[in-house]
Amino acid sequence: KGLICGRLEKLNENSNIKLPIFIKPRWGHKTASSKNCYKIKSWDELNKYKHIQDLMWSEFIDDNECMTDYILLNGTIVYQITYKYSPEQTGYIETWKYISPDNKPLPIITEWVQLHLNGFTGAVNVQYRGDKIIEVGLRLARGGAYILSTKNKYLIQNINNVVERNHWDYGLENKMKYDSYYS
């Protein structure tokens, strides 16, 4: 979503690219524990990482990270759960995430999901810093662990209904509350 980025192997020193930049693996499953994720402050520093295959780069976004799992049915968002990251980090890993039914994504993030996932049924995870989307995956965060941690069987049942039966039971919505928690 408007992010200046590209494949690292195609990046050459360029006066139009403002440093710092951020580099990371192109495939999300290869970034566990922020492996091979770096803030690059100079073109000389970048040369240390050029040999690593399948990296991407993006502008560095100095803003708090958030993440939202959306559940869609035929392109309509039927549920969302937003995870707020701690401002403190160890490397690029947050100290904690705050999960609450009161957390809401930025409207611009939801608008992007509605526009680009028109007709989609299932789960989508959107990670963003400020109003810039940095990663999108057709999955729940952490394999659904945060949803399971709500310990709300009605919420879990309704999400399963979307995937297994292409159905969202709106009658369960008043039973889908859960207590806020930190992870």
Regions found by a protein language model. Give the residues of each.
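Active-site nucleotide/adenylate-binding loops and adjacent lid/helix of ATP-dependent enzymes
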Residues: 1-112
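ATP-dependent carboxylate activation and anion-phosphoryl transfer catalytic cores
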Residues: 88, 101-183
